[in-house]
Amino acid sequence: MKKLFLLMAMMVTTIAAQAQHDEGDITIQPRVGLSYSNITDGDKWKLNIAYGVEFEYYLAEQFSLAGGVLFTNQGCKYDVYSDINKVTGEGIKLNLYYGTLPITANYYILPGLALKAGIQPAFRVKANVVQGSEKLDFDKMVAAFYGNDVKMNKFDLSIPVGLSYEFKGVTLDARYNIGLTKLTSDGDNLYNKVFVVTLGYKLGSH
């Protein structure tokens, strides 16, 4: 039994050493995964691909700053109803394509396990509404329906909070982005709500 505990202790020490970084280390991390998004009045959450790259600088063994670029397809799904209970058509997808610039402070509570929070400016590069084989430009639809009374914001600001775990350079990152910017210029309180889960591999100092 003593040998078993000794072996387990050695394994834990080895894993911790593999995930340890030193002050001054710099890593670059390609990332790919999934985003799960909605907006505050959306009927259903929408699943899409997220991908990008992140740079991380270690100010100390337990503290680092990270910044990067992540491309996400956000938005939501709606059901089409003819009355309260009956669905009469295919679901509608609202696709909001963003280039995001997440900046986070990371605190390693254990070797490889980090809590993170920060700020994320994002820029919408495209938006469309899809139903079946039909695809329409979302900004043109809003302009045709509302005229100049309503404008869609192309800039979005959010607060990312989450955690990550690294093992042998492979990192699993999960975060939730709290939307701060209204999607429209009118009085509606419409905000993005996004979960992002990605896998990455840290290149550089280990």
Annotated model-derived regions:
Residues 1-28, 199-206:
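Bacterial Sec-dependent N-terminal signal peptides
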Residues 41-42, 73-97, 125-153, 182-188:
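Flexible, solvent-exposed loop segments that connect beta-strands
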Residues 21-23, 60, 110, 122, ...:
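Outer-membrane beta-barrel channels and translocator barrels
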Residues 34-38, 71-75, 121-125, 167-169, ...:
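Transmembrane beta-strands of outer-membrane beta-barrel pores
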